[in-house]
């Protein structure tokens, strides 16, 4: 399958959805938010699915949905935890160019604010710093390209992301 999608990964607050919408408009592509696809498929909000299935159970649902995406000419914004699903990540790498929107920890904290309101779920005893340090190697492992978003304007990030095609 030809890689004509752009898949955005990164921490919550990195700007995946914001960059995704603007990038899709620039390229004339569809925009897909995989969190919304999950909610639509299961008929529940993400936090309801997490309450019902637990964090790891939610990761399984997320993996299954992302592994079955079949979009073409789309910008796909994923949930921050998509990288825990190896099946999903291998599939996304096959159907698109995976772009990691990288931010320093301090900027993630600044952008996120209230973790619960943003749907960021931490394991018992885990801090946001722990989560950040756990995920960074996974984002880097799966990314075809890394865009350092620190102190960059939206248009600069979109321009860099469009150049991956």
Model features per residue range: what roles?
Residues 25-36, 44:
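Post-Walker A helix-loop "phosphate-sensing" segment adjacent to the P-loop in P-loop NTPases
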Residues 8:
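Hydrophobic anchor at the beta1->P-loop junction of P-loop NTPases
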Residues 94-137:
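A glycine- and Lys/Arg-enriched "phosphate-lid" helix/loop adjacent to the NTP-binding pocket
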Residues 17:
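Walker A/P-loop
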